[in-house]
């Protein structure tokens, strides 16, 4: 019981926190096949992009997307892209997505700067966006 309890506390402490990504990977929008209003997404945000990986059965993903869309509406330099991984195991494997939502924070060139597994904490998102000059 103690082992399970400890594992639960460890998992909860890690969820929603940003991890610095040093891979230098630049996300290929063509491979994501993300759309907005039926049109392909062809550009990143002027300063930052929140790339959210979701699935059909993820209730937290809906809340996360709503929060990110609200942030996007308040800041013209920020773009939110949501990709449903339900039928995209290729992307889940490529980006090593083990839970949804998983959010990648990209700079203006699409380079991955940080990664958040699980429901993102608001203060963590704000801190990461400030690093990319988003207030």
Predicted regions and their residues:
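Structural micro-motif
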Residues: 96-104
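Thiol-based oxidoreductase modules, predominantly thioredoxin-like and allied folds used
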Residues: 76-90
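Anionic-ligand binding region
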Residues: 32-40, 46
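Conserved hydrophobic residues forming the short capping helix/wall of the S-adenosyl-L-methionine
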Residues: 68, 72-75
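Short active-site neighborhood of thiol/selenol oxidoreductases, capturing the structured segment around
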Residues: 43-56
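Conserved redox-active cysteine motifs that mediate thiol-disulfide chemistry
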Residues: 55-66
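N-terminal targeting signals for export/organelle localization
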Residues: 1-32
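Non-catalytic, surface beta->alpha helical segment in thiol-disulfide oxidoreductase systems
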Residues: 106-135
């Amino acid at each position: 019981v103690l082992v399970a309890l400890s594992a639960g506390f460890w998992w909860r402490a890690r969820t929603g926190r940003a991890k610095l990504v040093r891979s230098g990977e630049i996300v290929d929008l063509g491979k994501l096949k993300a759309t907005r209003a039926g049109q392909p997404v062809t550009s990143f945000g002027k300063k930052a992009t929140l790339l959210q990986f979701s699935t059909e059965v993820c209730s937290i993903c809906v809340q996360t997307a709503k929060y990110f869309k609200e942030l996007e509406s308040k800041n013209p330099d920020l773009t939110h892209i949501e990709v449903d991984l339900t039928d995209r195991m290729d992307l889940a494997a490529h980006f090593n997505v083990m839970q949804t939502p998983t959010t990648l924070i990209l700079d203006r060139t699409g380079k991955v700067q940080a990664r958040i597994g699980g429901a993102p904490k608001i203060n963590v998102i704000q801190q990461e966006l400030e690093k990319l000059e988003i207030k």
